[in-house]
Amino acid sequence: QRQMCIRDSFSPDPFERNLGRFRKTPNEGTLFYGLVQDGNDMWDATFFCGSCAVIRRKPLDEIGGIAVETVTEDAHTSLRLHRRGYTSAYMRIPQAAGLATESLSAHIGQRIRWARGMVQIFRLDNPLTGKGLKFAQRLCYVNAMFHFLSGIPRLIFLTAPLAFLLFHAYIIYAPALMIALFVLPHMIHASLTNSKIQGKYRHSFWSEIYETVLAWYIAPPTLVALINPH
């Protein structure tokens, strides 16, 4: 009952422009629109993002129109339609193009809104509970929501060395050698696995740059939304 497609950007985002990587490395959204949404579509769990969607009027009227309880009304509306048993289809072909965010502050502001909205949906209309969704659909939606909570553990590990130097506080109480023996194999394995799975859609090194910069800004609003989603 719904059809979604890709909205492409023909200008570099702030990271691509400042680091000189435009058209040289995959854009931040390439993984989501290239693999994740395609995978969601396999389980009838793809959701529309922004303007690139066609929705039948009757199903939309049945759920009371576009969801306005959260700031990510597109994903929330998709969830409600899936709960009612309606199906979706995803076209992995760019149907529209526009400008990417032109400044770092605008880019961060956009990601803050996405992060806050997805956590709001998790709290107000949790896909793990309630009727209407298949098990695979629940997992697809939860995966999209939990992604934006990654800023919290990332901040903890980024500030752990500083906490030790200033306050002699241990995040993990163990000798450095033991930490290396347990952590390094995991980090190497995770990096190689991600690179293998993501392939041309995302490069691990540049992904870490995006995620590290954004973590400082999306962690506070997602934490607040978890506690008070309204």
Show the residue positions of the predicted features.
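Intracellular alpha-helical coupling/juxtamembrane segments of multi-pass membrane proteins
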Residues: 100, 107-125, 205-222, 226
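Active-site donor/metal-binding and catalytic loop motifs
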Residues: 92-106
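General secondary-structure propensity
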Residues: 68, 101, 196-199
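Long helical/loop segments within the catalytic core of UDP-sugar-dependent glycosyltransferases
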Residues: 3, 7-71, 83, 104-145
